[in-house]
Regions:
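Exposed beta-strand-loop-beta-strand "reactive/processing" segments of non-cytosolic proteins
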Residues: 65-100
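C-terminal partner/receptor-binding element of secreted or periplasmic proteins
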Residues: 127-153
Length: 172
C-alpha cells in the first residue's frame, strides 16, 4: 500500500498537533502539581497553627500560610529530551528530582525508574480525555498517583488488558 503525498502531509499535521497538545498537557500537569503542593502546604500549616500552644507559633504558621498562597516554594518544570519530557521537581534549595516522564509523541505518562529513565509500564495516557482529566484533578506532588497498585487504576482502567499478560492494577 502506498501513501500519497497529501495523505502523508495530513498525517504529519495530525502528529504535530498531538505533539503540541502533549506539550500543553505536560505544562498543565506541572501547574496542577504546583497547585497541589500549595494546598498541601497550606493544609499542613493550618493544622499546625490549630495545634500550636504559643502565640508566636500561631503567628509563624499564619505567616507561612500567606507565603505559600502568594508564591509556591517549589517549582515543577519539564525538560525536553529526545523521547520524553522529564517532569522535574525543584525545591527552594535548588535540589532536583524527577517526578514523571511523558512520552513526547504519544502523551503516555510513566513513573521514573531513575533520574534518566522511566519505568517500563505506562501509567496514564494524556490523549485519553478521561485519564487526562483524572490525572490533572488527582495528581499529587509526591507522585502517589503514579503507582500501579493504586485503587484508581483498578477502578478506572481495569478493562485495559496489556500485552504483557495482566491488567493494570493487578499484581506486578
Amino acid at each position: 500500500m502506498t501513501t500519497s503525498f497529501a495523505d502523508y502531509v495530513a498525517q504529519q499535521d495530525a502528529r504535530n498537533t498531538i505533539q503540541l497538545n502533549v506539550r500543553k498537557w505536560t505544562m498543565m500537569l506541572c501547574d496542577a502539581l504546583e497547585h497541589n503542593f500549595t494546598e498541601y502546604t497550606v493544609r499542613a500549616h493550618k493544622r499546625s497553627a490549630n495545634l500550636a500552644d504559643r502565640v508566636e507559633d500561631k503567628a509563624y504558621h499564619e505567616m507561612k500560610i500567606k507565603e505559600a498562597q502568594e508564591k509556591c516554594a517549589v517549582k515543577f518544570t519539564f525538560e525536553e529530551g529526545r523521547k520524553y519530557f522529564k517532569v522535574m521537581f525543584r525545591d527552594s534549595g535548588g535540589s532536583n528530582s524527577v517526578h514523571a516522564f511523558v512520552d513526547r509523541k504519544t502523551g503516555e505518562v510513566y513513573k521514573p525508574a531513575s533520574f534518566k529513565a522511566p519505568a517500563k509500564h505506562v501509567r496514564f495516557d494524556l490523549r485519553i480525555i478521561e485519564q487526562r482529566e483524572w490525572v490533572l484533578k488527582n495528581c499529587d506532588w509526591a507522585g502517589d498517583y503514579l503507582y500501579m497498585k493504586g485503587w484508581h487504576l483498578k477502578k478506572n482502567f481495569c478493562s485495559l488488558h496489556l500485552s504483557f499478560g495482566f491488567y493494570i492494577g493487578e499484581h506486578v
